[in-house]
């Protein structure tokens, strides 16, 4: 019964009706979610991380719609569409729309000659699970638009555009790890990433009779609603204090635990603990990497 089908699928039907007669070239791009074996909050402190791509992914489909500037995007998960104009769009209060528009805005800053396009996306990365569903969404769209409009951007430019989308449109001052792992991850490999130099090394994760378990705590979080930016600001406050005595320090990456101890009475307890964690965590990442290699 087509009438009943239309009633149950009205949103999707009308979305595809917009483009069914003018679709030219449809591009489908995938980007993985990620786990981070060790290296928490070190990426935005120029530190080391040990992520790995997973088999959960975001899938984004895009195609030109024949207009100069109009874009229509369907979220398969939320069953909601969002329309915006390439010449005039701003962040909304919150939601997936900002991740999409943020990527578009950052590609435009790079000089991308975008035209009107439609798209839809879905994914298998659980939302709010800490496996970087947002980075996977951003990266899959960036890759798809790069192919659709033959923009010629390299992987690093796409990674950086996805990260800056989160900074400038979503409002989260995230590090580079999530987007880097989403684009550069390899099957059955972990990656040691230096978040300052962006040098990285792949190696197989061979655990013998042991396995890594990824457990669902059923606790959902959103970086935009969390204390993520606050934690970053606390780390930066610690660096600012330390720089008064050690001006060559650029980030907590450059600070030793001995140096940090000199400021224990000058830093708040919370800021001191944040800094202490980062310094120790960098050492733990390198120790874990060496252990996994042997």
Map each language-model feature to its residues.
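Short glycine/threonine-rich loop-to-helix capping motif typified by GTGT followed
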Residues: 130-136, 261-266
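Residue-level detector of intrinsically disordered terminal segments
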Residues: 11, 21-22
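Short acidic, glycine/serine/threonine-rich loops at helix termini
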Residues: 49, 130-133, 170-175, 193, ...
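Intrinsically disordered, low-complexity segments enriched in serine/proline and basic residues
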Residues: 2-13
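ATP-binding N-lobe of GHMP and related small-molecule kinases
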Residues: 22-135, 142-155, 160, 164, ...
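C-terminal nucleotide
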Residues: 22-34, 38, 59, 63-93, ...
């Amino acid at each position: 019964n087509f009438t009943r089908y239309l009633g149950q699928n009205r949103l999707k039907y009308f979305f595809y009706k917009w483009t069914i007669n003018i679709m030219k070239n449809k591009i489908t791009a995938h980007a993985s979610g990620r786990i981070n074996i060790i290296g928490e909050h070190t990426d935005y402190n120029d530190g080391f991380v040990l992520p790995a791509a997973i088999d959960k992914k975001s899938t984004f489909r895009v195609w030109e719609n024949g207009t100069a500037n109009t874009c229509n995007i369907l979220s398969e998960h939320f069953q909601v569409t969002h329309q915006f104009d390439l010449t005039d769009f701003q962040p909304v209060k919150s939601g997936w729309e900002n991740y999409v528009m943020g990527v578009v805005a950052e590609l435009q800053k790079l000089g991308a000659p975008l035209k009107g396009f439609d798209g839809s996306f879905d994914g298998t990365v659980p939302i709010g699970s800490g496996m970087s569903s947002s980075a996977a969404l951003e990266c899959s769209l960036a890759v798809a638009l790069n192919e659709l409009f033959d923009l010629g951007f390299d992987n690093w430019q796409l990674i950086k555009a996805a990260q800056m989308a989160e900074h400038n449109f979503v409002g989260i001052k995230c590090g580079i790890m999530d987007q880097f792992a989403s684009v550069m991850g390899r099957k059955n490999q972990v990656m040691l990433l230096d978040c300052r130099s962006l040098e990285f090394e792949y190696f197989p994760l061979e655990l013998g009779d042991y396995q890594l378990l990824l457990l669902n705590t059923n606790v959902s979080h959103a970086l935009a609603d969390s204390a993520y930016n606050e934690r970053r600001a606390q780390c930066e406050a610690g660096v600012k204090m330390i720089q008064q005595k050690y001006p060559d320090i650029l980030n907590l990456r450059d600070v030793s635990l001995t140096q940090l101890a000199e400021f224990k009475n000058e830093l708040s307890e919370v800021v001191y603990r944040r800094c202490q964690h980062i310094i120790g965590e960098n050492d733990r990442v390198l120790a874990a990497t060496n252990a996994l290699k042997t």
